[in-house]
Amino acid sequence: MTSKPAFEFTVSGIPLWLMREYLVELGGQQVADDIVNGEGWQAHLTKVEDFQIGSLRVGRVHLHVHGNAEALETLRPALEKKLVRAGG
């Protein structure tokens, strides 16, 4: 059995709704609160426990994207660019 190409990571400091919005801006369509489908890919979003130091709490989102290799090779760098720029 061959598995589909995929990537996943956990991002701190971004709410789930904003991660979902970024994926929609990159050509996806929201099909559920935690799923965005794009051409050749599907993303699953999961809110994970906040990172906390003292009274400071930072939200985190786990992202798992699978699909065809060509679609992921286009999506990943575009998404990473949005995640490193303040405000997308």
Give short role names for the model-derived ranges.
Residues V11-P15, E49, G67-A71:
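Beta-strand elements of well-folded, non-transmembrane domains
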Residues M1, Q30-N37, S55-V58:
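Short, ordered beta-strand-loop transition motifs
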Residues V24-D34, A86:
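Short secondary-structure junctions
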Residues N37-L56:
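A short, structured beta-strand/loop element
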Residues P5-F7, E39, G59-V61:
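A generic structural signal for short beta-strands and their flanking turns/coil linkers
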Residues S55-G88:
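C-terminal basic regulatory modules in eukaryotic proteins
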Residues M1-Y22:
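Terminal, regulation- and interaction-focused segments at domain boundaries
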